[in-house]
Regions:
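Bacterial N-terminal signal peptides that target proteins for export
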Residues: 1-6
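Bacterial N-terminal signal peptides
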Residues: 7-15
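Sec/Tat signal peptide C-region and signal peptidase I cleavage site
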Residues: 17-21
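Lipolytic serine-hydrolase domain surface
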Residues: 22-97, 131-132, 143, 151-210, ...
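Acidic, polar low-complexity linker/tail segments
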Residues: 90-120
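Short, surface-exposed "cap/lid" segments of acyl-processing enzymes
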Residues: 109-162
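Structural motif
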Residues: 121-124, 211-213, 244
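Gly/Ala-rich beta-loop-alpha elbow adjacent to hydrolase catalytic centers
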Residues: 186, 216, 220, 224
Length: 356
């Protein structure tokens, strides 16, 4: 109830900040979604490939540019068919974040399909890392997500932001630039979610018994951090829409919670934050040398003693298995069963197991 009240009071103020910053929406498929639990859900800012006659819909496999578009889709893992559902376009400049009202928002359809028709009450939004082509994002990352968290699918929907990332991990700096650009497109999704939750008339008629988590892995953390920095620079207040924000393998700098560095505002968009630290993370060790600065998921926050109680830091180094080390200790979100259970199901006050 407090969250709804906050949204009702704050979101109208956003509409007065920059009234010209709007989102145009277009339905591409209004048919009811299948109740098949194997269908993945994602949204992407990649460029849509013009399909030839008889060809399936797909997106640019390698794409680094900002599009000002978000496509919301379902994906059939068996037939590998992409079902375009909806497109949202930001009509203001590339770097400006939307603040105006959103007509015909896709969020209402998501609520109807998943909450009303399927009884799903938990929504987990995921911003993955870079070094992923589009094919790898949906056929590897999303497939493993559905498989490894299969026991949760009856009550939880996993929705992935398949952002325009670099296709090779070695091209690290290009991946950083792609995260910077994709942060601008992520503003479309975040504003639509905030506007949906602020619709007091809708919630008077529908049950507000849903929860939202945001999970960022690897460079997805940096994408979120850049989004927060730019939003603060534009003077747009944050809205507490998430019950928990979870930072895994964070490639954000170790001072990310310092004033003006982005994550100092995380508790303004979520009730609590969980940060996992693995001191045996190979890719983050390489990132440390490339940036000449410690990484949040490797060494932890520099100002850890000054963090509020709602931000919990858990070191998971002792739980990294030999299997995790085969991927240099960076892929435990989709590999380590002990940590997977803890990430989704445990309270922040719960201690991690002392060993595997």
């Amino acid at each position: 109830v407090k969250r709804i009240l906050h949204l009702v009071l704050v979101v109208p103020l956003l509409y007065c900040i920059k009234s010209e910053a709007q989102i145009e929406t277009r339905w591409l498929d209004t048919s009811a979604s299948s109740t098949n639990k194997e269908l993945g859900i994602f949204f992407t800012n990649r460029k849509l490939v013009d399909p030839g006659e008889g060809e399936d819909v797909t997106f640019k496999n390698r794409w680094l540019r900002q599009t000002r578009n978000l496509y919301f889709c379902r994906y059939d893992f068996e037939s590998k068919e992409i079902m375009l559902k909806y497109r949202a376009t930001k009509t203001c400049s590339k770097k400006k974040y939307p603040t105006g009202p959103v007509d015909n928002s896709f969020m209402y359809k998501v609520y109807e399909d998943l909450r009303i028709n399927q009884g799903i009450r938990n929504f987990v939004f995921i911003i993955p890392g870079h070094a992923k082509t589009f094919d790898k994002q949906i056929n590897d990352y999303m497939f493993r997500l559905q498989r490894n968290y299969a026991d949760s699918l009856r009550s939880t929907a996993f929705i992935t932001f398949a952002w325009s990332s670099e296709s090779l991990g070695a091209l690290y700096y290009r991946g950083q630039r792609a995260a910077d650009r994709s942060a601008n497109d992520f503003s479309i999704f975040e504003h639509m979610l905030e506007s949906f939750l602020a619709d007091s008339a809708f919630w008077q008629e529908h049950p507000f018994d849903i929860s939202f988590k945001l999970i960022c892995t690897s460079m997805g953390n940096e994408l979120l951090r850049l989004y927060l920095i730019k939003r603060e620079m534009q003077g747009i207040p944050l809205i507490p829409v998430y019950d928990r924000i979870i930072l895994i393998g964070s490639d954000a700098p170790a001072n990310a919670f310092a004033r003006g560095e982005g994550f100092d505002h995380l508790l303004e968009m979520g009730k609590s934050v969980l940060l996992l630290v693995n001191r045996r993370d190979g890719p983050l060790t390489m990132s440390l040398y490339m940036n000449l600065e410690g990484r949040l998921g490797l060494v932890g926050p520099t100002n850890i003693t000054k963090l509020p109680d709602e931000i919990v830091v858990r070191e998971v180094t002792h739980l990294i298995s030999k299997s995790d080390l085969s991927t240099l200790g960076h892929d435990y979100f989709l590999r380590n069963q002990v940590l997977m259970d803890y990430i989704l199901h445990q309270e922040l006050s719960s201690e991690l197991p002392s060993e595997l």
